[in-house]
């Protein structure tokens, strides 16, 4: 069995914090599946296909990473991908409580699914997709927080 991990998220948009975690996971695991969740209830800026394409662009240099969109329960996606490890990032102590609850629910639904938590590099510890969108909305420079392709995509969305 290969060492396959899923890194799920909405990735609206994918940030440098996400890509840092993906790159680090790619060094630890044989295969990393970036699972881009549909999450229509979150009212994303980018639709699912756009988020998948942006995530593919920023991870194209990582040969053992694939990006797949999904809907429904994460545990069903994990089974479909034949993965039994889930990776999640913890930016702050406040993230831990929520992630701990999710890990326990996922374990209850799929006992063989293990959750592994990674902390971000210090320079990425405060970056979130929500903050990036907020800074962009108010005309701030987001180039230090996202890949140039993502910054361009956000700018294009704003001019529509």
Swiss-Prot record:
Any GO CC annotation of this UniProt entry: cytoplasm
Catalytic activity reported: (R)-4'-phosphopantetheine + ATP + H(+) = 3'-dephospho-CoA + diphosphate
Binding site for substrate: 10, 42, 74, 88
Domain of life: Bacteria
Functional note: Reversibly transfers an adenylyl group from ATP to 4'-phosphopantetheine, yielding dephospho-CoA (dPCoA) and pyrophosphate.
Subunit structure of this chain's protein: Homohexamer.
Name under which the protein is recorded: Phosphopantetheine adenylyltransferase
Source organism per UniProt: Aeromonas hydrophila subsp. hydrophila (strain ATCC 7966 / DSM 30187 / BCRC 13018 / CCUG 14551 / JCM 1027 / KCTC 2358 / NCIMB 9240 / NCTC 8049)
